[in-house]
Structure formats: structure tokens, C-alpha cells
Amino acid sequence: MNNNLHKTVMDELTQDGDSAFRKYQDIYVGTRSISSLVKYELLTSLVSPIPGAIGFFLRRLFYKKLFAKIGDGTVIGPYLTLRCPDRISLGNNVFLDDNVTLDAKGEESHIIVGDSILIGKNSSLSCSSSEIHLGNNVSVGSNCYIRASRAPVKLGSYVTIGAHTVIISGNPSYKRLDIPMMKQKGKARGIAVGNDVWIGIGVKVVDGANIGNGCVIGAGAVVIRNIPDYAIAAGVPARIIGSRKD
């Protein structure tokens, strides 16, 4: 491949030569093992939709066979969407609400979730050849989207994320006109959020914008640059309007 071109997960999954069945295994299961495919199909098709206490018990019992790790006290709600679950680790006392998506497509992708985590209804953690790492005591509100594309997203401990927040690492390059932007090698820097951080409703955090320890990010802010420790930031783009130390 031309050194100026970036090979995406989509390239890997849509390339010629592999059968549709093999591509399905790569996208959904993450391995071409037939036994892993059968296990994935049975558990996600039969156990995932079951509501109530019976569904909770069955998922708690059988989903350990899918994930790389599930800690003690974990609760998984119905209609969990899983992609490549053997690259996903859940710590102790994790609560996944209804309709959560955990997607670890791409050979280098991993999702690592710490202890005492709440992921709200309809929220999605998605990787593309990178890693999402949540520390301990993290609350992710409903309808949030956290995406790691070619660079990691790492959240510290005691982080609160309001509903409808979007955190996405990875940037396209648009310098070359002769190469489609999605094929160009961007300079993905990743996103790091420190400890004891409050992120309000509907915040957007873009690649390379790190948030320090103890920060407060106001609702609807768009964070495009680094926010120092204990700063209070708001606006579009986000600017510092105060400090918790004052």
C-alpha cells in the first residue's frame, strides 16, 4: 500500500478475497473459530433480549463465556450489542443499561472498563484499531458516544459524563486532493480525561483535546484544546471561565 494511504478497518472488512461468512466472523465475533461463532450466536440471540430478573441471571451466568473478563457484581441489561467480545474486559460492579453497544472491531482494538461503572441506556463505546479505557467509578449518561479511532480514549476515575455527550479520537487528513480523505493518514493524538471530572450534557470532545484533573465542562461545550487541572470551561469552542481553586 502507498505510504500516503491509511488502511482502515473498513478496508480490512470489505477487501476482496474473503467470503461474506468470513467477514461476518471478523466483524461480529472477532475470530474465525467456528465454536466461538456458535457460542456468540446462541448467547446474543437467545439470552440478550430476555427482560427482567431471568434475563439478568442468564446473562450473568453465560456472558462470562463471551467476554475477555467479567468481574463480580456486574449487571448487563437487555439488548446489549456486542462486537468482538473477547477484546472487551469489564471490572467489578459494572452496570450496563438497556441497548448499550460495546464494539471492539479491528485487530488492535480493546475496551477495558474498570470497577464501579455505569453506562447509560443507548450509549456506545466503539473502537477502530485502538483502545477505550475507563478507570474506576465512572458514570456515562444515556445516549453517549465514545469512539476511539486510531488513537486511544482514556478516562480516569470518578468521572461523570452527561447524556448525549460525544467523545471521538482520530482526525482525517485533508491535505492531498488526489487521495480521498478517509484514506489519508491523519495525525490521531487521542483523548485523555483526568480524575474527578464533571462533563455536562451534550458536550463534544475532539481528538487531541485532553481534560485535566478536577475539571468541570459546561453543558453543550465543544472541547477542541487542552483544559488544565481544576478549570471550569464552557462555550463553543470551550474556554476557561473559572477555576475550582478560586
Model-flagged regions — what are they?
Residues 63, 75-85:
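Long amphipathic N-terminal alpha/beta scaffold segment
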Residues 108, 211, 222, 239:
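Short alpha-helical
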Residues 209, 221, 227, 236:
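Short beta-to-alpha loop/turn elements within the nucleotide-binding domains of ABC transporters
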Residues 1-73, 158, 164-165, 171-177, ...:
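Terminal amphipathic alpha-helical/low-complexity segments used for targeting or macromolecular assembly
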Residues 81-90, 95-207, 236, 244-245:
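Flexible, glycine/small-residue-enriched loop-and-beta-strand segment within the central core
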Residues 230-231:
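Extracellular disulfide-bonded cysteine-rich modules/repeats
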